């Protein structure tokens, strides 16, 4: 068989010519290894670079149930690109998944990330991964693997997308599923650190309309920093609370806000009645509502409105839970109670 003929004067092509820089990928791995190493914990077997990451379930679990979660950061990334601010979105990525699996009572064990871009910028990617490692440290889980995908033509230069994957464990007898929630139980609200990672399509629309100076002072920091504040990670204080108090249900307040997330842990026939005056609406949400002309009902179904996690306990345990969470450094309020639903009523109402 004759070899294929080359076009006249054609030069040989390389992967770099196609837009993929293998050397940049190798440089990134070298940069992020120290970040990942700081997250190592008991159970990690082997180092970074294998085809698969190995983790041994801690021996303290008699009947371990694995709990998994995956999420992204959404269009908060578009604001990160606009501001050229990439140091906080990694923590957002971790928080979205570890807070989700925490709701079932799970201790996060390990985390994996996926970073996709059109052209790999090593410094930007390393900054993002450093934030991921920070989030893993705050959650007590190991960053044991990930994927960096450089895909020319898929994303504009300077842009990327993120996905995260968390796996945790809970004792089978201690799974939290909301089945014990009853009338008279108390809903506690833990303060958010800001907008977290939901509602940014509306945030960006409000910014487009208001055209504010994002570098201007906003309650002691720039408006940009207030908007980009990383999602709070509630793992350690809530795992400690679960050791002392029977937590009946939890809801991570993400897309859908308070009114759509709390019902996910309530049995049919129960409603959580929340008092919107029980906690202060943070200045950032006041700013968004004012400049966007957003109705109260829309605020409560899009944004967390200052509450990042809801915890449901018995009335008898409520004061102890408040005290323990406050001692752990959390801002927390009694924001509502559980009662029987009325005919045709939603499972969470804000009054």
UniProtKB/Swiss-Prot annotation:
InterPro entries: PurM-like_C_dom, PurM-like_C_sf, PurM-like_N, PurM-like_N_sf, PurM_cligase. Its main location: cytoplasm. Pathway: Purine metabolism; IMP biosynthesis via de novo pathway; 5-amino-1-(5-phospho-D-ribosyl)imidazole from N(2)-formyl-N(1)-(5-phospho-D-ribosyl)glycinamide: step 2/2. It is found in: Cytoplasm. One of its GO terms (biological process) is adenine biosynthetic process. It comes from the Bacteria. Pfam families: AIRS, AIRS_C. Keywords: ATP-binding, Cytoplasm, Ligase, Nucleotide-binding, Purine biosynthesis. It catalyses: 2-formamido-N(1)-(5-O-phospho-beta-D-ribosyl)acetamidine + ATP = 5-amino-1-(5-phospho-beta-D-ribosyl)imidazole + ADP + phosphate + H(+). One of its GO terms (molecular function) is phosphoribosylformylglycinamidine cyclo-ligase activity. One of its GO terms (cellular component) is cytosol. Belongs to the AIR synthase family. NCBIfam families: purM. This is Phosphoribosylformylglycinamidine cyclo-ligase. The gene is purM.
């Amino acid at each position: 068989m004759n070899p294929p003929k080359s076009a006249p004067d054609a030069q040989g092509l390389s992967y770099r010519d196609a837009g993929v820089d293998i050397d940049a990928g190798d440089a990134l791995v070298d940069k992020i290894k120290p970040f990942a190493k700081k997250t190592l914990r008991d159970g990690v077997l082997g180092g970074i670079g294998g085809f698969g990451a190995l983790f041994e379930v801690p021996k303290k679990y008699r009947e371990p149930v694995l709990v998994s979660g995956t999420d992204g950061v959404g269009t908060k990334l578009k604001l990160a690109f606009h501001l050229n601010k990439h140091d906080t979105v990694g923590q957002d990525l971790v928080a979205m998944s570890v807070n989700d699996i925490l709701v079932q009572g799970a201790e996060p064990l390990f985390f994996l990330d996926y970073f996709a871009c059109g052209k790999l910028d090593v410094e930007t990617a390393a900054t993002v991964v450093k934030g991921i490692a920070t989030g893993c440290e705050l959650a007590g889980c190991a960053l044991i693997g990930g994927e960096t995908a450089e895909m020319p033509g898929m994303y504009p230069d300077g842009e990327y997308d993120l996905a995260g994957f968390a796996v945790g464990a809970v004792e089978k007898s201690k799974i939290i599923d909301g089945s014990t929630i009853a009338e008279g139980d108390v809903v506690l609200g833990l303060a958010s650190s800001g907008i977290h990672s939901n509602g940014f399509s509306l945030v960006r629309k409000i910014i487009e309309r208001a055209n504010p100076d994002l570098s201007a002072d906003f309650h002691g920091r720039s408006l940009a920093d207030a908007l980009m504040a990383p999602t709070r990670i509630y793992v350690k204080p809530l795992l400690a609370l679960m050791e002392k108090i029977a937590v009946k249900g939890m809801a991570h307040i993400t897309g859908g806000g308070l009114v759509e997330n709390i019902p996910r842990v309530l049995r049919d026939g129960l409603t959580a009645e929340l008092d919107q005056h029980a906690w202060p609406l943070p200045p950032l949400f006041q700013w968004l509502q004012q400049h966007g002309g957003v109705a109260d009902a829309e605020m409560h179904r899009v944004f967390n409105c200052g509450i990042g996690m809801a915890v449901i306990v018995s009335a008898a345990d409520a004061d102890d839970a408040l005290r323990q969470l406050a001692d752990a450094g959390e801002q927390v309020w009694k924001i509502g109670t559980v009662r029987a639903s009325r005919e045709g009523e939603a499972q969470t109402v804000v009054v």
